[in-house]
Amino acid sequence: MNFIFITLFENLIRPYFDDSILGRALKNEKIKIYFFNPRDFTANKYKKVDSYMIGGGAGLLINTEPLAETIKAVLENFNEVRFIFPTPAAKKFTQNDAKRLSKYKNLCFICGRYEGIDERIVEKYVNEVFCLGDFILTGGELAAMCFTDAIARNIKGVLGNEKSLDEESFENLLLEAPEFTKPDIFENLSINSEFLKGNHNKIQVLKNQMANSKTRFFRPDMFRKVIAKKGKK
């Protein structure tokens, strides 16, 4: 898969792909990354890309024309591009979105700065808008990296053990159960003895119980969906 970033700050994003799982995926060509900078498509010698908002208001927007030219350059270089705009004025990105988007060939993230981008760019070019959470960031780069990470790990061959995807949070509407490692007793806190007996069926039952309890406590909204789903059976 190709991940394309329209950004004024390539150096904020590129180091994230230097190491760990995404670094290995990039090296093995499971994913590729590309960058397009609106400053390269400006008509002024100062490479200025900010513009005042029509109608007034605090802050600036990325100028519409260089941004549109940047998008057109992406379309000239890639086929069937799906454009995504990270913005707090949208629905929250979910694990289901990550799975669905992992099936596409070319994803392009338009990383806003200042107060964002002209809404007409969104209407004409953007396929999907997503929010990272109920808070404001200084730019779209961090959200785009989070979305990319979540999407990439659903691509075949990116994770070393793909079965681990089946046991993560949000699968089956539950948060992931707590996990433990050595030592058996840590600072007077012990692991449930069932984990130490090696009976995998009983361990799975225990994990399911713990996942239900964790979901009920931290995400009652999700737990209500679990109850509703069970009621339909």
UniProtKB/Swiss-Prot annotation:
It is found in: Cytoplasm. This is tRNA (guanine-N(1)-)-methyltransferase. Homodimer. SUPFAM superfamilies: alpha/beta knot. Its EC number is 2.1.1.228. GO terms for molecular function: tRNA (guanine(37)-N1)-methyltransferase activity. Keywords: Cytoplasm, Methyltransferase, S-adenosyl-L-methionine, Transferase, tRNA processing. The keyword Zinc does not apply. The gene is trmD. HAMAP family: TrmD. Specifically methylates guanosine-37 in various tRNAs. It comes from Campylobacter hominis (strain ATCC BAA-381 / DSM 21671 / CCUG 45161 / LMG 19568 / NCTC 13146 / CH001A). It catalyses: guanosine(37) in tRNA + S-adenosyl-L-methionine = N(1)-methylguanosine(37) in tRNA + S-adenosyl-L-homocysteine + H(+). One of its GO terms (biological process) is tRNA N1-guanine methylation. PANTHER family: TRNA (GUANINE-N(1)-)-METHYLTRANSFERASE. S-adenosyl-L-methionine binds at residues 112, 132-137. It comes from the Bacteria. Belongs to the RNA methyltransferase TrmD family. InterPro entries: Alpha/beta_knot_MTases (IPR029028), tRNA_m1G_MeTrfase_C_sf (IPR023148), tRNA_m1G_MeTrfase_TrmD (IPR002649), tRNA_m1G_MTases_N (IPR029026), tRNA_MeTrfase_TRMD/TRM10 (IPR016009). GO terms for cellular component: cytosol.
